[in-house]
A protein has these predicted regions:
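Glycine-rich phosphate-binding loops of nucleotide-dependent enzymes
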Residues: 1-186
Length: 186
């Protein structure tokens, strides 16, 4: 969807209308909703695609090891075609591929969508670890309870407008959020 007004600025740089390679060079990566892995490529090939703009072979290998530490199942399946992975494994691969660009800001769109509860817990633990490693995470997530538990800052959007903001803990404790998004009355 093309924007018809407004601007997108990151680190003092206008991004609206910039080609994808310039956005990646600015340090931004995205893991879109629906996982979108390259089904006919192996896990390893998918991960290496995430680093396609990088020239530092040693850094790429180091980051590949880091992704495998975060997602040991990906290392076990590195030669398996991505299309044969489970939904949770494909989500791990999509996040891992985005990490291979060595982002400063990682945008995750609905990382828990369609996943089993145990896999969701794993994904959120890993998102927290990614953030601890110095990567800023912008998370769009309908699982408000899980998202707010890991959020430093959080926003409630209603029809495209920010209606509430605060720390994750503040919004978790807010009676309006509990009633509208967490299914609990105050």
């Amino acid at each position: 969807v093309k924007a018809d007004s407004g601007s997108i600025t990151y680190d003092g740089q206008e991004l609206l209308g910039k080609p994808i390679n310039k956005i990646l060079e600015a340090g931004i990566a995205q893991s879109p909703e629906g996982r979108r892995v390259f089904a006919n490529l192996t896990v390893l090939e998918n991960l290496k695609i995430g680093a396609y703009l990088r020239k530092d072979k040693d850094g790429i290998e180091k980051d590949l090891k880091w992704v495998y530490e975060l997602f040991p199942r990906l290392e076990e399946r590195s030669w398996q075609l991505a299309g044969t992975l489970s939904g949770g494994e494909q989500q791990m691969l999509a996040v891992g591929r985005a990490l291979m660009s060595r982002p400063k800001l990682m945008m995750l769109d609905e990382p828990s969508l369609g996943l089993a509860p145990l896999v969701v817990q794993d994904i959120f633990s890993i998102i927290r670890e990614i953030n601890r490693q110095g990567v800023t995470v912008l998370l769009v997530e309908q699982n408000a309870n899980m998202a707010l538990k890991i959020a430093d800052l959080a926003y409630v959007l209603e029809t495209g407008t920010i209606t509430m903001s605060g720390t994750g803990a503040e919004l978790l404790a807010d009676s309006r959020v509990k009633e509208a998004y967490l299914g609990k009355s105050s």
